[in-house]
Amino acid sequence: AIAAVITFLILFTIFGNALVILAVLTSRSLRAPQNLFLVSLAAADILVATLIIPFSLANELLGYWYFRRTWCEVYLALDVLFCTSSIVHLCAISLDRYWAVSRALEYNSKRTPRXIKCIILTVWLIAAAISLPPLIYKGDQGPQPRGRPQCKLNQEAWYILSSSIGSFFAPCLIMILVYLRIYVIAKRSNRRGPRAKGASREGKSKQPHPFPAGASSARPPTLTSSLAVAGEANGHSKPTGEKEGKTPEDPGTLTLPPSWPAFPNSGEGQKEGICGTSPEEEAEEEEEECEPQAAPASSASACNPPLQQPQGSRVLATLRGQVLLGRGLGAAGGQWWRRRAQLTREKRFTFVLAVVIGVFVLCWFPFFFSYSLGAICPQRCKVPHGLF
């Protein structure tokens, strides 16, 4: 029964991690540089399932090491190498998540495939530095026990403690601290998000405009009539603000050509913009933005809501960059939403990785804890062989 369960786990591990590698390498949406960590981690798990678990299963079922002694030493070194690599990979992924959340702009510019590959190489070098000492320095092995051969890990206290700290306890501590820090940042971001959004909109609505110094601040400027420069460039003539009943001292109204949609000011109801009278090259744009009024007595159509509305920001952004205010609002809003969506994805991925790492730590902690007790107090704290 144990052999059947372990065999199923071996096949499941190989198949599942192979799918992970295949998905990352073939899917365009998963070709982000940070996903190379998952490819390397999946490769380490496949190596554990193919080169370590089958021989461990045979050793447990037979009760002795059936294979050669040389392979026993290589097998133990590979066991430490692959398992340490898996744990350090998770530590590197947690650090990558932390840098992506806390230093998004700075770190994303450095998160290139080359940089990720260098980090992965460092992870494997750390794992190799922990696993190779038993192959190089074998120490005092003492007399070999009679009977059937056994294949056991290095029993020297210095190696047990150093390998346990480097393979598990240090990476585990780093991951816990990093994910606590990510949680604090995410919680602070959630609290500050709505306030920052409101402050950003308020700041944009009160942003200074390129109007004369005498402009009144009693109400926000509106786009009602045509600009003199724009009107002359387009060959249109339009009454000035004085003919419209405006005083020369009221420069708070910015003018648009007749082909541009009007932005009605609250309480004044200007009807300067005429939908459908624009040139042919701008007809499609204005048809999307303008909706004619249903009033029968009106010969013109009020096209767009006030500037403070999201629709107004979008309309201004379509005026081919000639109205800087609308263009800035659209760009800032789009950038804010892109940033918000990126943070949401980062937080979701961080939560999933936290669950995976938590399960991983719970699985490995009993082994490394009991393994370390053998070096600290080999006689009093000896763990039963069956439990170990």
Curated annotation (Swiss-Prot):
| Gene Ontology biological-process annotations | platelet activation; regulation of smooth muscle contraction; regulation of vasoconstriction
Entry function: Alpha-2 adrenergic receptors mediate the catecholamine-induced inhibition of adenylate cyclase through the action of G proteins.
UniProt-recorded Gene Ontology molecular function terms: alpha2-adrenergic receptor activity; epinephrine binding
To which species is this protein native?
A: Orycteropus afer
**Family note:** Belongs to the G-protein coupled receptor 1 family. Adrenergic receptor subfamily. ADRA2B sub-subfamily.
Q: Which PANTHER family match?
A: ADRENERGIC RECEPTOR-RELATED G-PROTEIN COUPLED RECEPTOR, ALPHA-2B ADRENERGIC RECEPTOR
Q: Could you tell me where the Low complexity compositional bias lies?
A: 292-302
Q: Report the locations given in the UniProt record.
A: Cell membrane
Give the protein name, as stated in the record.
Alpha-2B adrenergic receptor
Q: Where is this site: Implicated in catechol agonist binding?
A: S163, S167
Assembly, in brief, is: Interacts with RAB26. Interacts with PPP1R9B.
Report the principal subcellular site.
membrane
Q: List the disulfide bonds.
A: C72-C151
- Composition-biased stretches, type Acidic residues, lie in 279-291
